[in-house]
């Protein structure tokens, strides 16, 4: 194991340790990146595109989402923390947040657990679709803490790709259960171990990138040592990672935990969600001649991030008047993408983006 300095991004020391190697790589234009991905010449995790600065309109929508969602975040973070504390008893909890979407939730859970008197550790680690989890980062965590207290954290589920990566990555590593202990805020796909809800809702940190995730980029694949990331210094004036967690902590500390209903997450409900998700993805793939389900991005957060980072072809919403998809609709229209209202055809999802086939 190579020695490394503690790396916390723009978070406060103690909130998270990113097990990532800061790197500098040449930026790839979004259109060029799409061609390289779809041609198979490069994997998406070999490249980064410059993350654009959020517009004032984007920032306003983020703050509006936080104003509307902070109390819900506080309540659901507390419910998740209570559930984890109950399941692990006196055993220390080791949160391994999946970069980037899992990190804000991981920080909030870490703070909540510590405020409850639980021993908690928090790391940010890379997981990459089709390539798996960062084994070097897991080696570090396992060497320090063992495996019995490790919980993986992500913000939400889309169509279950990352859950599949976790299953494949952990099956040959001793000490992990058959079903990965994956905790999420929202699980419309029904594939997590523990979730606060199955709603596809406007999670504030789901519609912002580096500014709300410690000012780091997506992770970059490395075949040796820790995976990499870039520090997004060009976005430092928009940094809101600490503001988000501080806002949620403010509301969380007003709650009476004993008054909150325990989370009820049962396997039958999850099974129905999973099957409905499969049906929606299959319908869209058939209807719009999508040759790879990787091009289908279901859920408000995934659909919005796809429009921000990729080359979209179609954007579908359950209702065009749904205020939770306002940012997605606006971004799509800026790019000249037609937004189609689909009603109940989208199942549990309120939005889906399909990436354009460029080859």
List PLM regions with ranges.
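Contiguous, well-ordered alpha-helical segments that form the cores/surfaces of helical PPI scaffolds
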Residues: 103-112
């Amino acid at each position: 194991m190579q020695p490394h300095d503690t790396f916390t991004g723009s978070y406060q020391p103690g909130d998270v340790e990113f097990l990532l190697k800061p790197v500098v790589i040449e930026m790839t234009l979004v259109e060029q990146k799409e061609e390289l991905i779809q041609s198979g010449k490069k994997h998406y995790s070999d490249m980064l595109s410059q993350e654009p600065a959020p517009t004032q309109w984007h920032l306003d929508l983020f703050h509006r989402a936080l104003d509307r969602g902070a109390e819900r975040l506080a309540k659901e973070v507390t419910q998740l923390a209570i559930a984890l504390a109950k399941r692990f008893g006196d055993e220390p909890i080791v949160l391994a947040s999946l970069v980037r979407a899992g990190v804000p939730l991981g920080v909030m859970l870490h703070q909540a657990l510590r405020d409850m008197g639980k021993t908690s550790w928090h790391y940010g680690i890379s997981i990459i679709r089709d390539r798996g989890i960062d084994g070097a980062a897991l080696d570090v965590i396992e060497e320090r803490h063992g495996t019995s207290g490790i919980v993986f954290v992500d913000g939400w589920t889309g169509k279950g790709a990352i859950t599949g990566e976790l299953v494949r990555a952990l099956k040959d590593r001793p000490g992990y259960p058959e079903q990965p202990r994956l905790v999420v805020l929202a699980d419309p796909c029904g594939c997590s171990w523990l979730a606060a809800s199955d709603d596809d809702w406007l999670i504030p940190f789901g519609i912002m990138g580096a500014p709300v995730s410690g000012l780091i980029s997506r992770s970059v694949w490395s075949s040796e040592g820790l995976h990499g990331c870039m520090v997004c210094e060009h976005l430092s004036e928009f940094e809101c990672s600490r503001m988000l967690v501080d806002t949620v902590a403010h509301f969380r500390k007003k709650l009476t935990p004993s008054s909150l209903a325990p989370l009820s997450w049962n396997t039958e409900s999850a099974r129905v969600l999973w099957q409905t998700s499969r049906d929606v993805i299959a319908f869209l793939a058939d209807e719009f001649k999508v040759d790879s389900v990787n091009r289908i991005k279901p859920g408000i957060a995934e659909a919005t991030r796809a429009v921000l980072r990729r080359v979209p072809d179609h954007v579908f919403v359950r209702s065009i008047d749904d205020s939770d998809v306002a940012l997605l609709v606006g971004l799509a229209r800026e790019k000249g993408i037609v937004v189609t209202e689909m009603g109940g055809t989208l199942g549990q999802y309120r939005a889906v983006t399909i990436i354009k086939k460029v080859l």
